[in-house]
Amino acid sequence: MDEEYDVIVLGTGLTECILSGIMSVNGKKVLHMDRNPYYGGESSSITPLEELYKRFQILEGPPESMGRGRDWNVDLIPKFLMANGQLVKMLLYTEVTRYLDFKVVEGSFVYKGGKIYKVPSTETEALASNLMGMFEKRRFRKFLVFVANFDENDPKTFEGVDPQNTSMRDVYRKFDLGQDVIDFTGHALALYRTDDYLDQPCLETINRIKLYSESLARYGKSPYLYPLYGLGELPQGFARLSAIYGGTYMLNKPVDDIIMENGKVVGVKSEGEVARCKQLICDPSYIPDRVQKAGQVIRIICILSHPIKNTNDANSCQIIIPQNQVNRKSDIYVCMISYAHNVAAQGKYIAIASTTVETAEPEKEVEPALELLEPIDQKFVAISDLYEPIDDGSESQVFCSCSYDATTHFETTCNDIKDIYKRMAGSAFDFENMKRKQNDVFGEADQ
C-alpha cells in the first residue's frame, strides 16, 4: 500500500465508485478503500435477509415464511433509474451495462384524495384517466404539446414564455391548469419534492418534464428502470470498471487518518502504512469534521406478501404522494420491487416508503404511505442524517459526496458526481464524448 496515487477514494457508495471508474478511465492511478467488508456503503443491498434483521436489531430473525435468506437483496436506499437520465448515460458511456440486467418498472402512480391513480403514460391513458376532468384534459394536453415542442435555442417555440425569467407558476397560469394538475405535473412528472420550484424560472421544470416523457417513450410502462439483484449491483459494476483500468481495491480496510500538510491532503494512513495521493474523494462518514448536517430522511423498508392494492398487481411500481395531498412541505415516496427482480423470495414484495423529515415524529409522517401497503409482514425503520461538505475542496483537495436524498431517482446523485468531477478536474463533465456507445441498456442499438 505504501505507494503514490493520483486519487484515493474512501467508501464504495455509488457516487464514489462512479468517480473512481471515471478517474481510472481518464488514466489516473486510483486506490479505492472501504472500511466495510462489502461494497455500497450507504447505498448497498443487504443479503442474506438474516443480515438485515441483525442490522436493525430485530433479535428473533426472519420467520420461515420469508423463504431462503440468500434469495433476498434489500436496498437500504430506494431509487430507480430514469431510462433517459444521466446515470443510464454514464452506464452506457462506460459500458458498465455489460455487468447488469435491467427491468422496466411496471407503473408509476400518484396519490390523490386518499386513492392512487396511474400516472398516464400515453395520450390515450391521459384521456381515459380519472385524475382530471374533460376540459382540464384538453388544457393539459395543450401544455404537454408546448413542453414537447419547447427548444431553449429556438425562440419560435417559446409562445411568449421567457425560459430564464418566466416562473413556472406563470406557465401553469398561461395554460389555466388547476391545482390538482399542477400538483401532479410538478411532483409526478417533474419529480420535485417541494413546491419551491413554482417561483423559479420555468426552463428547469420544462426540461424535467421532457426527461420524464423521453424516459417513458423509451420503454413504455414507466420511465423507470431497476437492476436485477438490487441497486448494490451498480457500485460493483463501476468498481469493476475501475479495476479494469488499473484501479486498486481494498475492502475491510480501516482508515486511521487522513494526512494533511499545509491544509492540503497528502495521503491516507491505514494499519500503520501510508498511501500518498494528490486528491481524495470520500463519503461524509470518513470526514465528520468537514461536513454539516442538512436535514434527515426517514426510510421504512416493508416486506409484503402481496402486490400493492390498486396497482393492477404490478410486481414493481413507484407511488408519489404529493405534499399538498397530505399537508406537508415534502412529498412522500414509495418504491416497490419484488421476487421478479431477484431481490426477494418467491411471492414476496419489498416496498420502501421515504420522505424528508419535517417533525419530531418521523414515523407518523409516512403513515399515509404505510396505509397503502397494509398488511405489512415486517417493517425496518431507518432515520438517516443528511450531510453535505462545508467547502468545495479546492484548497484541501478533499472532495466529499453528499448523502443520498429522499428522491426516488439518481438525478441528484449524478449532479453531485458532475459537480465533484468539475471541482477535481477543473473542467466540466462532458457527456458528448460518451456518445460513442450508441446502445441502450438492453443492448439494442438506437434506431
Curated annotation (Swiss-Prot):
Query: Under what name is this protein listed?
Result: Rab GDP dissociation inhibitor alpha
UniProt superkingdom? Eukaryota
Quaternary form?
Interacts with RHOH. Interacts with the non-phosphorylated forms of RAB1A, RAB3A, RAB5A, RAB5B, RAB5C, RAB8A, RAB8B, RAB12, RAB35, and RAB43. Interacts with RAB10.
Report the principal subcellular site. cytoplasm
Entry keyword annotation includes Kinase: no
- Pfam families per record: GDI
Q: Name one GO cellular component term.
A: myelin sheath
Q: Which GO terms describe its biological process?
A: negative regulation of axonogenesis; negative regulation of protein targeting to membrane; positive regulation of axon extension; positive regulation of toll-like receptor signaling pathway; protein transport; Rab protein signal transduction; response to calcium ion
Range of residues in the leader sequence: none
Q: Name one GO molecular function term.
A: Rab GDP-dissociation inhibitor activity
In this chain, where does the modification Phosphoserine occur?
A: S427
The gene name on file is: Gdi1
Organism listed in the record = Mus musculus (Mouse)
The record's tissue-specificity note reads:
High expression in brain, lower in other tissues.
Give the InterPro entries listed for this entry: FAD/NAD-bd_sf (IPR036188), GDP_dissociation_inhibitor (IPR018203), RabGDI (IPR000806)
Which compartments does it reside in?
Cytoplasm; Golgi apparatus, trans-Golgi network
**Physiological role:** Regulates the GDP/GTP exchange reaction of most Rab proteins by inhibiting the dissociation of GDP from them, and the subsequent binding of GTP to them. Promotes the dissociation of GDP-bound Rab proteins from the membrane and inhibits their activation. Promotes the dissociation of RAB1A, RAB3A, RAB5A and RAB10 from membranes.
